[in-house]
Structure formats: C-alpha cells, structure tokens
Design a protein with these regions (language model features):
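Beta-strand-loop-alpha-helix segment that lines the small-molecule cofactor/substrate pocket
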Residues: 1-38, 53
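A general structural signal for well-ordered alpha-helical segments in protein cores
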Residues: 16, 43, 87-91, 191-197, ...
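C-terminal helix-rich "cap/oligomerization" subdomain common to oxidoreductases
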Residues: 17, 24, 199-241
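Short glycine/serine/threonine-enriched helix-capping/active-site loop
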Residues: 32-35, 61-64, 104, 237
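Rossmann-like dinucleotide-binding domain that binds NAD(P)(H)
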Residues: 70-132, 138-143, 213
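NAD(P)-dinucleotide binding in Rossmann-like oxidoreductases
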Residues: 113-116, 128-195
Length: 241
C-alpha cells in the first residue's frame, strides 16, 4: 500500500534500511517522504538556475534556520533530525550529489535555551565535490521564524527571497511583519507535494517524489551530524545498509 511519511523516514538507520529493502522487494515506489522544500516555488526556481549552469558550479552555501520557540523536551539530536534534516535533503536535491562529511558546533547559549540544550548551533557539511554548506540552526530565535539561503557559484550568487509581506510606513517608522512558524512560510510547498503524490499514484505524474532511499540517505547524514555533536570533530557519513 502506498504511504506518505512525514520526515524523518524512521528514527534509526536500521529501520530506514529495512523500509528500503521492503520497497525494493515490492518492485515499485511505495513511500514518499515529506521533504516539502523540493516543492516550494522559490526553491524550484533556484534548482532551475543551478541546473541551467548559467552561474557555473556551486561553491558554497550559507543558510539560516530560525524558529522562535520550541516545545519542552526538545534535544540536541532533534536539532538535526527535526530541523537540519530539511537542509540535508534540500542540498542533496539542489546539488545532485551526496553530503559526505559534517560537523556540528555549539555557540554561546541563548538565555531562552532549556537546560541541556545547545542553542544556537552551527552545522558544516561538505558534498562529494567539496561544496561547503553552513547552516545556523536556532530553535529559540525569539523574534520570529526565518529561513534563509544564499548559494555562491563561480559566476554569481542565488539568494532565497524572504516571504512577501506588506511594507508599512507610519509614525516615523518603516517595516514589515515577520512570520511566526513554518506553516505560514511553506503552505504552497505542502499543497504541491501532496498533489504530486496523488498525481503520481494516479499515473498522471510519471516522476516519483523523494522516496525511501532519500529518507535513508538523510538518516545516514543525520547520524554523522549527531555523532559530531558529541565528538566535536568532522564526522564521515556511512551509507552502508
């Protein structure tokens, strides 16, 4: 039976591998994983620019992932499995190559971080061709929800635009509101991914969305990043099943 699974595919590499094996035995795509940024219109435009080659090869990427608050019980590992997992998948998709090593670094803690939680954290990841990716991850940013990305290429850069909000000028001030959460930032992405999944099941859309192998790869990369939270060093990704 076809299944749409919210990310992550599973919480352990072994469970992800078992899902991949079951799907392979069935001989067809059964699982789509909810990596919805692949369906966001802005990300798709960036993907098209990269694929065109007009800016040359990508060299580096700088990202921010800021959430104003998080529920009790949030752990350091969840910074990777619940937050960074999106950047892990989006760059596998955008660059068309694997992330092969990474490191997590802790900064000075915000006063809003719960006991035992390092926040913010900085993720460094390298692809097979040595594209360097840095991601600032914060789940206690206080001021609002913000996702940012700039990709540095040989002939120029590509920056993810901020959500369009009315700019108000009044009483000696000018400014705009900042959104509060992911649901306000990615409504089209969620609609598009579910419609794509339905269309694929009905035979209207020939190309499958992110599947069990993508979920497995993301889990392998996440494991390396979580290991780095403890070791403090660069960790290689192990893709062995």
């Amino acid at each position: 039976k076809p299944v749409f699974c919210e990310k992550p595919l599973a919480t352990t590499k072994a469970d992800c591998a078992e899902i991949v094996r079951i799907e392979q035995a069935a001989g067809r795509n059964l699982v789509q994983v909810g990596f919805m940024r692949r369906y966001d219109p802005d990300y798709r435009k960036i993907k098209a620019i990269l694929d065109s080659g007009e800016l040359g090869k990508p060299l580096m990427a700088h990202c921010i992932s800021r959430t104003p608050r998080i529920a009790a019980g949030f752990t350091n590992a969840m910074q990777v499995t619940n937050v960074l997992i999106h950047e892990i998948d989006q760059f596998r998709w955008l660059f068309g190559e694997e992330l092969v090593r990474g490191q997590m670094l802790a900064a000075r803690n915000t006063a809003f971080a719960a006991d035992g939680l390092n926040d913010p954290q900085l993720a460094l990841m390298w692809t097979e061709s040595n594209i360097l990716i840095d991601v600032e991850c914060s789940v206690n940013s206080y001021y609002g929800y913000e996702i940012g990305m700039e990709i540095v290429c040989e002939k120029g850069t590509i920056r993810l635009p901020l959500p369009a909000e009315p700019i108000v000028r009044s009483r000696l001030k000018v400014g705009n509101e900042i959104i509060d959460n992911w649901a306000e930032r990615f409504p089209k992405a969620y609609d598009n991914e579910l419609q794509h999944w339905i269309n694929h099941l009905r035979g209207i859309e020939p190309t499958a969305g992110p599947g069990s192998k993508d979920g497995f790869a993301a889990c392998c990369i996440a494991d390396a990043m979580i290991a780095s939270q403890t070791s403090g060093t660069v960790e290689a990704v192990n893709f062995d099943m």
